[in-house]
């Protein structure tokens, strides 16, 4: 359920963009009527309408995700708060300035913030971030936690670079597709590799899984 909620804003962004892209003139008229007060000049063009509408949806979806967790009395992860702040500020800039550049940079900034968190946690808090998150559920040797922590830092740093590369070398439509499915697919593959590595070094009753 949590994983679904995490990816829901991205999926809704993609769906909104694609629907609006297929009906650009109608989307522009709708955006001008309903978002005119939020954009510089008050008029939304057909070329920019899809990404502006998708941006509004992703802001609202992320806010709804936070409110849902709060109403259920569940903890809102720090990174979700960061994501909400980034999408609100950068998404707001995209809407006001009619510029897709800001929302395209948002995933990269978030990825780099997460990469920095994994790198700085051992220095600031004296423990690997992943170990702090999963240490109570999984027992691994210290060296394994360290490697996993560095792997996550490298993965997020690389994803940030990849997102910008796609954003500046391909169309907005291609970028939106990559954002929804490319990033998600790479995340699943990486998590699978992490799971296999964890299983290899996992301790069961004090014995490593690969030695049992």
From Swiss-Prot:
Disulfide bond keyword on record? no
UniProt keywords, alphabetically: Cell inner membrane, Cell membrane, Membrane, Transmembrane, Transmembrane helix
User: Which Pfam families does this entry report, sorted A to Z?
Assistant: IspA
UniProt cross-references to InterPro entries, sorted A to Z? YciB (IPR006008)
Subcellular localization is given as: Cell inner membrane
Query: What is the recorded membrane topology of this protein?
Result: Multi-pass membrane protein
* TM stretches of this protein: 49-69, 78-98, 105-125, 150-170, 178-198
User: Per its UniProt record, what PANTHER family does this chain match?
Assistant: INNER MEMBRANE-SPANNING PROTEIN YCIB, INTRACELLULAR SEPTATION PROTEIN A-RELATED
Name the job this protein performs.
Answer: Plays a role in cell envelope biogenesis, maintenance of cell envelope integrity and membrane homeostasis.
The name under which this protein is listed is: Inner membrane-spanning protein YciB
The lineage, from the top, is: Bacteria, Pseudomonadati, Pseudomonadota, Betaproteobacteria, Burkholderiales
């Amino acid at each position: 359920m949590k994983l679904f909620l995490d990816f829901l804003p991205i999926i809704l962004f993609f769906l909104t963009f694609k629907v609006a892209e297929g009906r650009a003139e109608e989307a522009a008229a709708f955006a001008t009527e309903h978002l005119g007060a939020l954009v510089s000049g008050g008029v939304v063009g057909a070329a920019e309408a899809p990404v502006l509408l998708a941006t509004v949806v992703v802001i609202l979806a992320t806010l709804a995700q936070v409110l849902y967790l709060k109403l259920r009395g569940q903890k809102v992860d720090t990174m979700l708060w960061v994501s909400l702040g980034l999408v609100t500020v950068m998404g707001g800039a995209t809407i006001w300035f009619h510029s897709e550049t800001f929302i395209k940079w948002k995933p990269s900034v978030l990825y780099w913030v997460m990469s920095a968190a994994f790198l700085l946690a051992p220095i600031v808090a004296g423990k690997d971030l992943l170990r702090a998150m999963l240490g109570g559920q999984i027992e691994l040797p210290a060296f394994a936690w360290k490697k996993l922590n560095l792997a996550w830092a490298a993965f997020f740093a690389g994803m940030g670079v990849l997102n910008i590369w796609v954003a500046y070398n391909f169309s907005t439509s291609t970028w939106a597709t990559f954002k929804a499915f490319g990033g998600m697919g790479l995340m699943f593959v990486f998590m699978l590799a992490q799971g296999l590595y964890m299983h290899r070094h996992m301790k069961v009753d004090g014995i490593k899984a690969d030695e049992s």
